């Protein structure tokens, strides 16, 4: 069995990713607060800002992983806020980073050691991973950081048989 675990697959790019993986024969698991409406997707409801919820979800996912020949762990969940340097409070930035970055780190930390060789860790980036536009302060910061996380992951996973990329 080949498996895709996608955070935030309930809407947008995550939902489209779920459809694409299903079309390629993957068993797809959506990890998010809301269910994915795509038929055939297994939903694991999880608040990605809550450490206990992530830990419980990872316990469930470890069983899924043990039954898989290959896993694509797709970090897609994201908050996109319209904010600016002068408007974004530290609390608001922390909330965005919790979903956009810290959740990916938590999932990696708890699941990487269980992924079989030939698996992949995919980060959903943006053109704003490398540039900026006005009115997207917290989003730009988090996407730049996600690119850094992928680059660091690439170095750390070298030789493990696990591929990583930012898309």
Q: Where would I find each of the regions flagged by the language model?
A:
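N-terminal Rossmann NAD(P)H-binding glycine-rich loop of SDR-like oxidoreductase domains
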Residues: 10, 18
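Conserved NAD(P)H cofactor-binding loop of Rossmann-fold oxidoreductase domains
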Residues: 76-81
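Active-site helix of classical SDR
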Residues: 108, 142-143
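Residue(s) in the substrate-gating loop at a strand-loop-helix junction
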Residues: 126
């Amino acid at each position: 069995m080949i498996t895709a675990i996608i955070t935030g697959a309930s809407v947008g790019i995550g939902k489209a990713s779920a459809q694409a993986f299903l079309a390629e024969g993957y068993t797809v698991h959506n990890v998010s607060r809301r269910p994915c409406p795509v038929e055939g997707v297994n939903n694991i409801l999880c608040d990605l800002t809550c450490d206990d919820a992530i830990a419980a979800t990872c316990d469930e996912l470890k069983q899924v992983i043990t039954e898989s020949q290959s896993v694509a762990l797709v970090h897609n969940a994201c908050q996109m806020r319209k904010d600016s340097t002068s408007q974004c409070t530290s609390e608001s930035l922390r909330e965005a980073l919790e979903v956009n970055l810290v959740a990916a780190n938590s999932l990696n930390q708890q699941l990487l050691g269980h992924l079989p060789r030939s698996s992949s860790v995919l980060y959903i980036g943006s053109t704003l991973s490398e540039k900026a536009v006005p009115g997207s302060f917290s989003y730009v910061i988090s996407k730049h950081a996600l690119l850094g996380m992928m680059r660091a992951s690439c170095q750390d996973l070298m030789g493990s048989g696990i591929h990583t990329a930012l898309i």
